[in-house]
Amino acid sequence: GFPPVNVSKEKKTMSASETADFNKAQRQVLTMPAIWILALSSAFMYISRYAVNSWGVFYLEAQKGYSTLDASFIISISSVCGIIGTMFSGVISDKLFGGRRNVPALIFGLTNVLALCLFLLVPGVHFWLDAVAMILFGLGIGVLICFLGGLMAVDIAPRNASGAALGVVGIASYIGAGLQDVMSGVLIEGHKTIRNGVEVYDFTYINWFWIGSAILSVFFALWVWNAKQK
């Protein structure tokens, strides 16, 4: 007959020396400046990512005069392109750059900055320009999520502590995303005026907050350009 399916497998237990090495590697991750710098870079990238995801439709309506339908469609482009960027991030680094993450991280970090500048600094309704900006933004963010949010940290962390490295970067990233929502809300509401019974928003500070975050993400990524595994 068939072998029993409910027989539990023996769990492999680590020896005392293996446990000591594992714990040492976990602590080593927390003392690696490169991991924390990558975490900062990813956090600032997440600020720009969730700024557009959370506030992009409102921005297009209030600042540029788009309808809700058109604004939603334009922002949705970035999500689709983000999937494409994530899918091809490994091919980009392995095939085009010989496994190096720093060069594509710089290229797509600058792509993210360019996309935000096109999106935020060109006034008025320019449907195709804003659509192109969201294509660039989505591709850039999709690649950066893989590199800044994971692969670059795993590459330089001890092999038996890659999970800890991902944890540090992931926590920092979502802290950045959460702070972004609070800061963006404060800046938008704090620069609202009423003119002839109509709410008017000054997005100047929002523009520089979002673009500045993308620039800082690139800046911190450059700090770990030559970081190696310990």
Annotate each language-model stretch with its function.
Residues G1-L38, Q63:
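Juxtamembrane intracellular "pre-TM" segments in multi-pass secondary transporters
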Residues L30-S89, I145-C146, G150, A177-G185:
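Extracytoplasmic gate region of multi-pass secondary transporters
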Residues D94-G109:
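Cytoplasmic membrane-interface "Motif A"-like loop-to-helix N-cap segments
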Residues G98, M152-S162:
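Paired intracellular helix-loop junctions of major facilitator superfamily
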Residues R100-V103, S184-A214:
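A membrane-interface helix-boundary motif in multi-pass transporters
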Residues L110-G124:
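C-terminal ends and interior cores of transmembrane alpha-helices
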Residues F119-P123, W208-K230:
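Multi-pass alpha-helical transporter architecture, strongest
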Residues R159-K192:
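A late C-terminal transmembrane helix in Major Facilitator Superfamily
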